[in-house]
Amino acid sequence: AFYPILIGLGAVGYMLWKDFDIQVFSGITFSWHMVFWLVMAVVFMFGRDIGYIIRIRILSNNQLSWRQAFRVIMLWEFTSAITPSAVGGTSVAIIYVHKEGISVGRSSAIVMLTSFLDELYFIVMFPLLILIVGPSELFDVSTSSGVLTRSLMGIALTGYFLKLGFVLVLSYGLFVNPRGLKWLLLKVFKLKFLRRWYHAAGQTGTDIIRSSHEIRRYNYKFWLKACSSTFLSWSSRYLVANALIMAFFAVSDQFLLFARQLVIW
């Protein structure tokens, strides 16, 4: 797991060295305020990965050790960073978890649950932040007209309801009728323009059935811990940008910064 870290640090170091411009830094006045928020950005980065590590241990019922969980998350993050967003690290995460001695069925369940919890975080947080910040503030751009603001709101709501639909369908498959969802997937992907992904849809349906058998055994304490670690990881991820902006600019509305990042995601 240390090789991906070294490769990543080496690549970042090279890009910083290549693009370094002393003239840019000459206009920055360093202060204890800046140092504090830069340190906080690093703390939030650690919080993000610690949340992921805690969560994957919880999802494995502590079958993964801390070291194994760290290794899986580092490989997962590295894969997500170097692959196209359409692929991401999720497609190979099952392999990483399985390599640590967990069965394929349980590995599928763990990875499926991480996706479910990630989407659930957005589904819950988006309306809460809309209530706190207000839609007019969230989508207002100083140079925009009312038409553009409404268009941005429409795009965000479309994305939200698509994610909500995904979560509802996945919830139905995981908790209610996994075989029925697999049957529906196969029917949909028999359509001519979707037929090329028919076998992949069948595999997804099989993964959902395997995952469902695992998930139905979990109690409310498990879900509370899993949701708490998800909240820690994703909130820390967004707060990194908040801290970096606070280091260089005077910003009063932290919720607005946080909410706009969530909408972009």
Feature names for model-found ranges:
Residues 75, 79-83, 106-131, 161-165:
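Membrane-embedded alpha-helical segments of transport systems
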Residues 57-61, 81, 93-102, 231:
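Helix-loop junctions at the membrane interface of multi-pass solute transporters
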Residues 1-74, 141-265:
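Predominantly cytoplasmic-facing regulatory/coupling regions of multi-pass membrane proteins
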Residues 48-56, 85-94:
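Transmembrane helix boundary and interhelical junction motifs in multipass membrane proteins
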Residues 126-143:
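Transmembrane alpha-helix termini and helix-breaking/packing motifs in multi-pass membrane transporters
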Residues 67-72, 85, 89-90, 100-116:
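Membrane-interface alpha-helices at helix entry/exit sites of multi-pass transporters
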